[in-house]
Amino acid sequence: MKPAVDEMFPEGAGPYVDLDEAGGSSGLLMDLAANEKAVHSDFFNDFEDLFDDDDIQ
């Protein structure tokens, strides 16, 4: 027996909707821009080049 949606997500569906209901991809992009997250000011960005294959041994 598969759990019902309200059993899996008791807090509700949240901001997630079908693309058909959101008005297509443009509505989805607007939702993404409205829900943009900010990086903490103390975030230490020392990742160098993650896609640099020259240093693979």
From Swiss-Prot:
GO terms classed as biological process: cellular response to UV; positive regulation of cell population proliferation
Localization of this protein: Nucleus; Cytoplasm; Nucleus, Nucleoplasm
A Pfam family: MYEOV2
Major localization listed first in the record, in broad terms: nucleus
The keyword Nucleus is annotated on this UniProt entry: yes
Top-level taxon of the source organism: Eukaryota
UniProt key word Iron: no
Signal peptide: none
Keywords: Cytoplasm, Nucleus, Signalosome
One Gene Ontology cellular component: nucleus
Function: Component of the COP9 signalosome complex (CSN), a complex involved in various cellular and developmental processes. The CSN complex is an essential regulator of the ubiquitin (Ubl) conjugation pathway by mediating the deneddylation of the cullin subunits of SCF-type E3 ligase complexes, leading to decrease the Ubl ligase activity. May play a role in cell proliferation.
Assigned protein family: Belongs to the CSN9 family.
UniProt subunit comment: Component of the CSN complex, probably composed of cops1, cops2, cops3, cops4, cops5, cops6, cops7, cops8 and cops9.
UniProt protein name: COP9 signalosome complex subunit 9
Primary gene name: cops9
